[in-house]
Amino acid sequence: MLSRLLKEHQAKQNERKELQEKRRREAITAATCLTEALVDHLNVGVAQAYMNQRKLDHEVKTLQVQAAQFAKQTGQWIGMVENFNQALKEIGDVENWARSIELDMRTIATALEYVYKGQLQSAPS
């Protein structure tokens, strides 16, 4: 009887150990599946973030190139406007010079006319 109880007890312990081992393996399998699912889920987010970062880097490079082109074009426009402004100033200088010459010529013409009329009046007829 004692040996039978001992055998039953050992059999129950073996069953419990096997059941516990089975549950441990199932728990490990479930934990592994959960871990893989979480990693996959996180990897999707990381992959999306990586793709977004690559797109942003490309856009930044494009923007830098366009900004450099815009700066160059703006510099050219500024140069053209400065040249145009200088040309307008020169035209204004020429116009002022022409007015000055015209005024001097009128003064000379008036003086010559005055002298000529004075000579005509003083000449004996």
Swiss-Prot record:
It comes from the Eukaryota. GO terms for cellular component: axon cytoplasm; BLOC-1 complex; BORC complex; cytosol; early endosome; lysosomal membrane; mitochondrial intermembrane space; mitochondrial matrix. It catalyses: L-lysyl-[protein] + acetyl-CoA = N(6)-acetyl-L-lysyl-[protein] + CoA + H(+). It is found in: Mitochondrion intermembrane space; Mitochondrion matrix; Cytoplasm, Cytosol; Lysosome membrane. One of its GO terms (molecular function) is protein-lysine-acetyltransferase activity. Disulfide bonds: none annotated. Keywords: Coiled coil, Cytoplasm, Lysosome, Membrane, Mitochondrion, Transferase. Its EC number is 2.3.1.-. Belongs to the BLOC1S1 family. This is Biogenesis of lysosome-related organelles complex 1 subunit 1. It comes from Rattus norvegicus.
